[in-house]
């Protein structure tokens, strides 16, 4: 794609285009990171020091960057074409979509698909080999359901969803529109509900459901459990990484981001815009407010107010954790001084 054509596409995107300086209207064939980019490739830049480190060895043909006079001066000194936007990362994401077309799957049902007569399938859907669709399940329009996926009975799947290979969607699950469920993820499995009695465990039946609102994306090997009654909810726009466990009856708000190996125990309530970094654990029935940020390996055992940034185990305000961490490193030295004082 000619660089000028790419600029026109970026202008119509969401990155807030400012200007473009094209030294050669070269054919852009693909994209690469700045340190390995070669001719006919495009990259993006958000930090001055990265450019300075790589400017001498990169052969990149064009760079998407922000409006920084120092960066633009360095690029112009090397005759590197540049596209200036307010958000280079968003522009680069759009460029990747333009340059790398996704493989199209023509609508159709593979001969090996098992689909119960009581189920309903919308228009323009693709069902790959060995897909199973259970009783009374309703699937909307323009869905792609890839090989080996099992969708059990009474499921409602909206429009424009992508279900990748070998997923399992249990009965009574509701998934709205424009969602992506990646491979080997299980939606709606039984919650971990057992009642102790006389040294034994009595199983609590899990008869609730899972509701996933529109524009949710869930990574590979995730589990979203259903509760005994009511529902587990993942609200609109939330993004979930790989290997995440969401317990029964959990409520997750809009536009949250959950990184790998997050675990949320049953009944927890997560507000809107929450960011949980890798391996964060949330205790059962805890309430996490809106726009909370929890750093990696954080253990949230009590309610967190709106807008807090928390770290550590148990979770505390980030500033307090930084101070505590600094003191912790000095404990051997402090202990030595205490022993010396005791001797006196």
From Swiss-Prot:
Active site positions: 248 (proton acceptor)
EC numbers: 2.3.1.191
GO biological-process terms attached to the record: lipid A biosynthetic process
Keywords: Acyltransferase, Lipid A biosynthesis, Lipid biosynthesis, Lipid metabolism, Repeat, Transferase
Metabolic or biological pathway: Bacterial outer membrane biogenesis; LPS lipid A biosynthesis
GO terms, molecular function: N-acyltransferase activity; structural constituent of carboxysome shell
A GO cellular component annotation in the UniProt record: membrane
SUPFAM superfamilies: Trimeric LpxA-like enzymes
InterPro entries documented for this protein: Hexapep, Hexapep_transf_CS, LpxD, Trimer_LpxA-like_sf, UDP_GlcNAc_AcTrfase_non-rep
Any Pfam family: LpxD
Chemical reaction(s) catalysed: a UDP-3-O-[(3R)-3-hydroxyacyl]-alpha-D-glucosamine + a (3R)-hydroxyacyl-[ACP] = a UDP-2-N,3-O-bis[(3R)-3-hydroxyacyl]-alpha-D-glucosamine + holo-[ACP] + H(+)
Biological role: Catalyzes the N-acylation of UDP-3-O-acylglucosamine using 3-hydroxyacyl-ACP as the acyl donor. Is involved in the biosynthesis of lipid A, a phosphorylated glycolipid that anchors the lipopolysaccharide to the outer membrane of the cell.
Subunit structure: Homotrimer.
Similarity comment: family membership: Belongs to the transferase hexapeptide repeat family. LpxD subfamily.
Record protein name field: UDP-3-O-acylglucosamine N-acyltransferase
Protein source organism: Prochlorococcus marinus (strain MIT 9515)
UniProt gene name: lpxD
